Swiss-Prot record:
Subunit structure: Heterodimer of a B chain and an A chain linked by two disulfide bonds.
Cysteines engaged in disulfide bonds, as pairs: 30-92, 42-105, 91-96
Stretch forming the signal peptide: 1-23
Family per similarity comment: Belongs to the insulin family.
This protein's UniProt keywords: Carbohydrate metabolism, Cleavage on pair of basic residues, Disulfide bond, Glucose metabolism, Hormone, Secreted, Signal
Function of the molecule: Insulin decreases blood glucose concentration. It increases cell permeability to monosaccharides, amino acids and fatty acids. It accelerates glycolysis, the pentose phosphate cycle, and glycogen synthesis in liver.
CDD domains: IlGF_insulin_like
Annotated protein name in UniProt: Insulin-2
Compartments, record wording: Secreted
Cross-referenced InterPro entries: Insulin, Insulin-like, Insulin-like_sf, Insulin_CS, Insulin_family
An annotated GO cellular component: extracellular space
Gene Ontology BP annotations: glucose metabolic process
């Protein structure tokens, strides 16, 4: 009985100090929540973000192929509709973990 009483505080500390499963679970992170999570995960290393490049690609997709480009694309109509795989698609539209966010650290 005395051994049990000595181990009880240790068991309680371990029980209450385990990480919350929600904190480690995959989550939707959008906007400022995504930025805060990146700061948390990356710390002093920082993270990379290239919005201008993304806008250039999106603009090309909106405009579609030019008239002189249509000849080479007759059998490839989805050629210019590329799938995006950025951090917003990965963590906001879908879910991601803190471990996946680490891929965006410098």
């Amino acid at each position: 009985m005395a051994l049990w009483m000595q181990c009880l505080p240790l068991v309680l500390v371990l029980l209450f100090s385990t990480p919350n499963t929600e904190a480690l679970a995959n989550q939707h992170l959008c906007g400022s929540h995504l930025v805060e999570a990146l700061y948390l995960v990356c710390g002093d290393r920082g993270f990379f973000y290239y919005p201008k490049i993304k806008r250039d690609i999106e603009q090309a997709q909106v405009n579609g192929p030019q008239d002189n480009e249509l000849d080479g694309m007759q059998f490839q109509p989805q050629e210019y509709q590329k799938m995006k795989r950025g951090i917003v698609e990965q963590c906001c539209h879908s879910t991601c973990s803190l471990f996946q966010l680490e891929n965006y650290c410098n």
